[in-house]
């Protein structure tokens, strides 16, 4: 019986037996399977081959990321807070705030992400929390991030997220008061219109600063609020930009601002697929804030469907040199913005492309032309992609147009790097492709990379939260 008992124990461990109930493995759970089926339908709506290597496992990866990113629906604040309240007496009898440790406690710069309920794209949240302890007890500092995560890992809007965090801490910790300030950053929506693309729209973000207060922080004109804001200003938070206008908060998502431009022709099956995803995440698709979400999400996604944009490369004739061919010199086209969608997770990545090539001094000073280069970058960006492939494709397309010597560098921020378990905020990725002279001439590559550094050092760049 000993061997049999051991075998039964191993079986229970393998299938995840808990409290007499069988817990299905993640990949076999109904919610995961439903999301995978919906994602397959969306990929087909983008005219993609769901069996193509590279996106064959995309439905599962998307399901995993979405369920991971909305796990807060199944989490409870009390599970994190109740075991982390520690006794701490006030400084002296009658001294300090409400019998606590003597004053305000501020926890700053808690990085999180949440999914925007208006468009289903992730947005970055930098959370700052202040509270005045009461009842001679304090909360373990790590639990502030845990509590924030419970509510961030849901479909949210910034103001409700701030209110949820504030009310939960007030209820479970029971301090004299709680103050919450959130710095939220949402990526812009891309446009298929090449003329509308510009560097600022790629490096900039829609930013919003919201707050919530309870107890002694209910009055935002109080001295305590001023003290809390002072601690935030030490870290460069521009508290004067706090949004106290409800309509501004509701319209902060770029998809809401452009709702009047929504296409009336949306595939009903694709809409049903997004509705199925919402249900599988534990949401109510009929909640008023979510009614237009499937259509907004599809408007964004359909930007990246497989299409044949006319680049008119066949009509392009490289400039010929008149007379004696002189020494070739380096030509550069830097900071050309692009948008793309990661084919592994169906999340955006965006950034800039730098192109360098050699051509004879006696030829046209800009033989290819900025507009054609931007069109090529635009063409390879607006589709399901991986950055490495996009960089190579741009180089291979340009090579015969510029005489073979070309270098392409792409720099991008990947949303999938922040909105999944890895959560690498502030990370970026650079890729390089070289052909012709650049593949063997180290000094040529160094000259081009120095051009990028010198040019960007002279510019004031807006910071990215990703």
Swiss-Prot record:
Which residues are listed for Zn(2+) binding in this entry?
342, 345, 416
**One MF term from GO for this chain?**
GTP binding
Cross-referenced Pfam families: GTP_cyclohydroI
Q: Which pathway does it take part in? A: Cofactor biosynthesis; 7,8-dihydroneopterin triphosphate biosynthesis; 7,8-dihydroneopterin triphosphate from GTP: step 1/1
Keyword Transmembrane helix belongs to the record:
no
Q: Which residues form a coiled coil?
A: none
**A single BP term in Gene Ontology:** folic acid biosynthetic process
Keywords, alphabetical: GTP-binding, Hydrolase, Metal-binding, Nucleotide-binding, Tetrahydrobiopterin biosynthesis, Zinc
Recorded E.C. number(s)?
3.5.4.16
Similarity field: Belongs to the GTP cyclohydrolase I family.
What is this protein's function? GTP cyclohydrolase 1 is the first enzyme in the biosynthetic pathway leading to folic acid.
Q: What is this protein called?
A: GTP cyclohydrolase 1
């Amino acid at each position: 019986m000993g061997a049999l008992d051991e075998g039964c124990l191993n079986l229970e461990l393998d299938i995840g037996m808990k409290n007499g109930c069988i817990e299905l493995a993640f990949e076999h759970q109904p919610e995961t399977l439903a999301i995978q089926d919906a994602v397959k339908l969306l990929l087909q709506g983008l005219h993609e081959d769901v069996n193509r290597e590279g996106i064959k496992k995309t439905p599962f990866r998307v399901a995993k990321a979405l369920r991971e990113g909305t796990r807060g629906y199944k989490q409870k604040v009390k599970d994190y807070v109740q075991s982390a309240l520690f006794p701490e007496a006030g400084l002296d009898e009658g001294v300090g705030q409400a019998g606590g440790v003597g004053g305000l406690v501020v926890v700053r710069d808690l990085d999180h992400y949440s999914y925007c309920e208006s468009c289903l794209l992730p947005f970055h949240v930098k959370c700052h929390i202040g509270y005045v302890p009461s009842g001679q007890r304090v909360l373990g500092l790590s639990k502030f991030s845990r509590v924030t995560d419970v509510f961030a890992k849901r479909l949210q809007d910034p103001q409700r997220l701030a209110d949820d965090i504030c009310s939960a801490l007030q209820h479970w910790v029971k301090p004299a008061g709680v103050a919450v300030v959130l710095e939220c950053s949402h990526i812009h929506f891309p446009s298929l219109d090449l003329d509308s693309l510009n560097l600022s729209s790629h490096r900039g973000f829609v930013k919003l600063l919201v707050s919530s207060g309870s107890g002694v922080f209910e009055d935002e004109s109080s001295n305590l609020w001023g003290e809390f804001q002072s601690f935030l200003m030490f870290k460069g938070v521009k508290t004067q930009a706090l949004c106290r206008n409800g309509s501004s908060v509701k319209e902060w998502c770029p998809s809401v601002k452009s709702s009047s431009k929504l296409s009336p022709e949306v595939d009903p099956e694709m809409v049903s697929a997004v509705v199925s995803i919402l249900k599988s995440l534990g949401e109510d698709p009929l909640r008023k804030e979510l009614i237009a979400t499937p259509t907004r999400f599809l408007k964004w996604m359909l930007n990246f469907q497989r299409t044949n944009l006319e680049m008119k490369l066949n009509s392009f004739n490289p400039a010929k040199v008149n007379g004696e061919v002189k020494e070739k010199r380096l030509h550069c086209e830097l900071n050309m913005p692009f948008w793309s969608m990661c084919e592994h997770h169906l999340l955006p990545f965006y950034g800039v492309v730098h192109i360098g090539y050699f051509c004879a001094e006696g030829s046209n000073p800009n033989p290819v032309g900025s507009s054609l280069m931007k069109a090529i970058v635009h063409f390879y960006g607006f589709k399901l992609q991986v950055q490495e492939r996009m960089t190579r494709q741009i180089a291979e397309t340009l090579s015969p147009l510029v005489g073979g010597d070309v270098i392409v560098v792409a720099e991008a921020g990947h949303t999938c790097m922040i909105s999944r378990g890895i959560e690498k905020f502030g990370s970026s990725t650079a890729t390089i492709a070289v052909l012709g002279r650049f593949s063997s001439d180290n000094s040529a590559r160094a000259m081009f990379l120095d051009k990028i550094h010198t040019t960007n050092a002279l510019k004031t760049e807006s910071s990215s939260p990703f």
